[in-house]
Amino acid sequence: MKMLTRLQVLTLALFSKGFLLSLGDHNFLRREIKIEGDLVLGGLFPINEKGTGTEECGRINEDRGIQRLEAMLFAIDEINKDDYLLPGVELGVHILDTCSRDTYALEQSLEFVRASLTKVDEAEYMCPDGSYAIQENIPLLIAGVIGGSYSSVSIQVANLLRLFQIPQISYASTSAKLSDKSRYDYFARTVPPDFYQAKAMAEILRFFNWTYVSTVASEGDYGETGIEAFEQEARLRNICIATAEKVGRSNIRKSYDSVIRELLQKPNARVVVLFMRSDDSRELIAAASRANASFTWVASDGWGAQESIIKGSEHVAYGAITLELASQPVRQFDRYFQSLNPYNNHRNPWFRDFWEQKFQCSLQNKRNHRRVCDKHLAIDSSNYEQESKIMFVVNAVYAMAHALHKMQRTLCPNTTKLCDAMRILDGKKLYRDYLLKINFTAPFNPNKDADSIVKFDTFGDGMGRYNVFNFQNVGGKYSYLKVGHWAETLSLDVDSIHWSRNSVPTSQCSDPCAPNEMKNMQPGDVCCWICIPCEPYEYLADEFTCMDCGPGQWPTADLTGCYDLPEDYIRWEDAWVIGPVTIACLGFMCTCMVVTVFIKHNNTPLVKASGRELCYILLFGVGLSYCMTFFFIAKPSPVICALRRLGLGSSFAICYSALLTKTNCIARIFDGVKNGAQRPKFISPSSQVFICLGLILVQIVMVSVWLILEAPGTRRYTLAEKRETVILKCNVKDSSMLISLTYDVILVILCTVYAFKTRKCPENFNEAKFIGFTMYTTCIIWLAFLPIFYVTSSDYRVQTTTMCISVSLSGFVVLGCLFAPKVHIILFQPQKNVVTHRLHLNRFSVSGTGTTYSQSSASTYVPTVCNGREVLDSTTSSL
């Protein structure tokens, strides 16, 4: 009362009295329930639905109106009979109808504060003798109010009641706004605020991966604040709102049809979230039925598990997911309610209208085209189901009673009756010191567990627990089935849920991506995306990112990670091996055969004249070149890689060092002949061997240094264009391997140059020509090999095969051009493998320990020397 001046109070009183008297202008007689008592509790219930057009009130609300009203009367009766709760104190009631409208409810609630106004101002009406004036029609003094139902109603009423410090407990208002104690400091409720329900609904959407949904809310605090809380929870879970619609208070059919048309404009949003009052939900479902629209509805407790909402539109509501506050049915109330009829229930002025509406009959013989109600009609299990919030109505009445009981025990310790201290209640003390601190087990609840405790938190809110229902058709009968619950976390029995199309519906802005695709989110929209395929070598780090597995790895079948690819290398059973190995084996056999022939005929003139020491070195190099095929085909390992690097260059160095020594010897001899010089130095067999070994040693030293600087090993190599294949290779580049042959190339070039210079030697030295043929052919082979080697770098099998065959062909060139003719003479023309005398002029000859140049006559024998030995005549030396 400190907030109102005395003039404001009187004005409010006048307005309230005049306004309440004017209610009859709407052709709707104001009805109420008044039962006197020591303490009186007010009650606000949506006994009638809101009217249409100019009508304030509509049809009787059978479940949320009549049942809840009777639940309060039932609870009052039980408390008045209780010997332990408020013994000696009789509770009365003053129950009013809100007609499901906040403005109408506010008008009605003015009746609750009239008594407070009267009590406050009674001192102004004192008689001259000191007595108080006698007042007629004194309103009942309200200790507290139970209600309202809709949040918009409770907010309007709470704003009024707080001015007069009248505590209020709602049994159904769930708007989050009502938790604001700075504005609603005399309000409490036995139900939780909507943000718990909004969280539960968002978790249901996330559970089914419904990320693109539409919303519809009723105008007013329940719908608007509820959907706002839902949108906040949805954003936290990356759920997008396709379209957000709101139904106004007009209750016109066209507005609901318009909402359905807007919902149909978003075909990908197959799920529609409803935060609507029950009458709005019913009209929206009816509009969907008229439009033959099919959606999956996820509805708040405004829909709950009410049959009246889906009546006549069951096929449209099939598969809906709805939430209802978790509650236990009050079985004692069932017996009480089923015992009522118009003939024994005279305290409820709306009950006769309820009876006529429920049974579609008339209790009076009126000409309204209705049959007269049979006196044997009764409420039973076939036509009655307890409304879901009956328990909360009963708990609200008992909570107020427990608070009054504790206050009475404190203020009136010596009596069970009311004392003077409670004649005029201190609403502030009642609310803060007693009501917010109550803690008792819910009456009529068979389960004595934590869920049955009734108490309020610091904001005056109840505990947040919800049941999840699914609207199903079982055996041709539609009904709600409990399929889960929410209490901080969601629990669902998915197998029990029925869907309109027999499968979980999808509600996403974009179609789900394939298992090998990632989502490319569109700017400014977390729910719409474009599916982009991952590369074959990428895995899905998450649904938005394809990650490269990296060289040598490949994604698993489910693309959740990567595994190491098996190493690929030439195996002995591969078809590619047949050619190189066959050629190498054939070459090695030929080399062994030549060596055998030479050893067997080691002291024959032909073998001696061929420079057998260099021949054996040359044959060793040729044999080693054939062995390289096996090193290149063997599985790479540090040892094999070292042998490849050492053997390839060394085999060529051995061959071409021996050939270079030979061609150099011939060139120096005949350069000396032309210049008239003395016999060249270092043409003896031992000198030639040392020169050859020296040339070979250079290559060995170079390779050894290379092996030290770059230790041999293996590496897993992957081609950019063939990421699915990992090749096991030696840890050297192909270019490095070829660079290591630079020295051999120099030897080849020098051999070729010397072979070219000695191409016109006398016929006794036609071996120089065969060396020339060898070098020319070798150059052609390697000039052809190099481009093939690099062109086939993408296929290691072809590259390795090319390398092996080229090396083997180089060996065959040496065998074919240099040794095949000699072997042919030795084996098939032994008569030519002899020393013969023939006239030759201008030859170096051996004389004692020195070499002299002389002009010989026809009868003089002048042996030709090279490598310190005589050579045969043109018939043999040319070989």
Swiss-Prot record:
Summary of subunit composition and partner proteins: Interacts with TAMALIN.
Keyword Heme (UniProt): no
Gene: GRM3
Protein name from the UniProt record: Metabotropic glutamate receptor 3
UniProt main location, coarse: membrane
Family to which the UniProt record says this protein belongs: Belongs to the G-protein coupled receptor 3 family.
Ranges of the Cytoplasmic topological domain: 600-613, 665-688, 757-769, 829-879
Cleavable signal peptide: 1-22
Residue positions the entry lists as glycosylated: 209, 292, 414, 439
TM ranges: 577-599, 614-634, 646-664, 689-709, 735-756, 770-792, 803-828
Keywords annotated in UniProt: Cell membrane, Disulfide bond, G-protein coupled receptor, Glycoprotein, Membrane, Receptor, Signal, Transducer, Transmembrane, Transmembrane helix
Subcellular location: Cell membrane
Topology feature Extracellular, residues: 23-576, 635-645, 710-734, 793-802
Functional description taken from the UniProt entry: G-protein coupled receptor for glutamate. Ligand binding causes a conformation change that triggers signaling via guanine nucleotide-binding proteins (G proteins) and modulates the activity of down-stream effectors. Signaling inhibits adenylate cyclase activity.
